[in-house]
């Protein structure tokens, strides 16, 4: 049976030790491993002792990796597991490490959800559905997700959502109906619920002055008509142009009037 002949502190890490058996280096061990097994010089080790030492030290390596990983920011269980797997920690040890992290409150999904909620509300233009997706992707339990999504909806000021919508509106040009559609689509993509969007839309003035709309119609008409002329005859080009402009949200009568004004249609 092997005998402990030397235990020395590692030069680069004062909390790890080199374990020598029968005069030869056997392995590096964590200070907690040293204490747990009460290792000392001249100690005789059973074969089962070595297996237990190796398994425990592997677990302690996982714990130290997890603590270091969690020291930079809050993490979820899924994130910690993925990190440990990348660092070659065995699956049975990973579960023990996760249990330790929960016990010491290093992993706390409610705290994580609360922190992410506050960060997103105050620093992003995203709605509760994007928040929901993030929590789901991070492996948060469904019950916690539902609880904190509801809190997100209640705590996000409607005025903030209105500001987001107004910013989007200013970047869009075209008929009122089309601008409303684009703003709605943008808010949906940002994770806002349709009910919230409806409230926001009722608070915004989408009206544009006639001169601006007339200029936009003229610009789009020329662009669309010239494109259609390369594909169709004159009559069909006019029909296709009217259809395209109506899809853009322009009023039929205004389109006809602009066509006549441009000398394209005299009907």
Curated annotation (Swiss-Prot):
Principal location listed in the UniProt entry: cytoplasm
Cell compartment(s), UniProt: Cytoplasm
Functional summary from the UniProt entry: Modulates RecA activity.
Pfam family, one: RecX_HTH3
Coiled coil: none
Identification of the protein by name: Regulatory protein RecX
The species this protein was found in: Staphylococcus epidermidis (strain ATCC 35984 / DSM 28319 / BCRC 17069 / CCUG 31568 / BM 3577 / RP62A)
Sequence similarity: Belongs to the RecX family.
Example of a GO biological process term: regulation of DNA repair
């Amino acid at each position: 049976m092997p005998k402990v002949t030397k235990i020395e502190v590692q030069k680069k890490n004062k909390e790890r030790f080199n374990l020598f058996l029968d005069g030869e280096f056997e392995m590096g061990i964590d200070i907690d491993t040293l204490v747990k097994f009460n290792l000392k010089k001249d100690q005789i080790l059973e074969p089962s002792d070595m297996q237990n030492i190796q398994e425990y030290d592997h677990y302690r390596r996982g714990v130290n990796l997890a603590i270091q990983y969690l020291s930079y920011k809050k993490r979820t269980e899924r994130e910690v597991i993925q990190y440990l797997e990348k660092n070659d920690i065995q699956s049975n040890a990973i579960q023990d490490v996760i249990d330790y992290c929960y016990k010491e409150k290093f992993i706390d999904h409610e705290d994580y959800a609360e922190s992410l909620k506050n960060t997103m509300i105050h620093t992003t233009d995203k709605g509760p559905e994007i928040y929901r997706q993030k929590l789901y992707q991070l492996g948060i339990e469904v019950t916690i997700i539902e609880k904190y999504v509801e809190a997100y909806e209640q705590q996000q000021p409607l005025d903030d959502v209105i500001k987001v919508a107004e910013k989007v509106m200013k970047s869009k040009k075209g008929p009122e109906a089309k601008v409303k559609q684009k703003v709605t689509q943008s808010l949906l993509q940002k994770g806002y619920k349709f009910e919230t969007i409806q409230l926001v839309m009722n608070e915004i003035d989408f009206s544009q002055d006639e001169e601006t709309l007339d200029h936009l119609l003229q610009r789009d008409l020329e662009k669309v008509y010239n494109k259609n002329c390369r594909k169709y005859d004159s009559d069909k080009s006019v029909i296709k142009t009217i259809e395209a402009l109506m899809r853009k949200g322009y009023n039929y009568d205004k389109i006809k009037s602009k066509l006549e004004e441009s000398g394209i249609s005299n009907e």
